């Protein structure tokens, strides 16, 4: 699955400040992947398989990070009331036509919306408060 079209963790701040920059970014060559990005993709895929397809945490070698993410989800939803979908494309309508990102989990508990984007703690530090990528969603 393609995780984003221009909008990602590193570009969201720029796009919020200057929506027109998306045209310039679209003309740039793709950035090479990093080992941090590749590990993050593996962990994101594992969370999707665990939550949506019943895979077992023990099946993954990086399971300590997965356990921390699942523990955080259990804090959000201790009574297992969450209705959710994983790997959800989020489109931005007329604000940024043709641009999308993906959040790792979109759901609700009664009338409360829950949007999660797993950050596994390697490479670039990411703050949850005022997080530009989540502000898009």
Predicted regions and their residues:
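Short, charge-rich amphipathic segments
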Residues: 2-5, 64-66, 116-120
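Weak global preference for isoleucine
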Residues: 6-7, 16, 28, 50, ...
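Extended aliphatic helical segments
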Residues: 7, 25, 50, 57, ...
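A non-catalytic, helix-rich entry segment at domain boundaries
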Residues: 31-94
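Mg2+/Mn2+-dependent nuclease catalytic core
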Residues: 80-137
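Charged, glycine-rich intrinsically disordered N-terminal tails and low-complexity linkers that flank
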Residues: 1-54
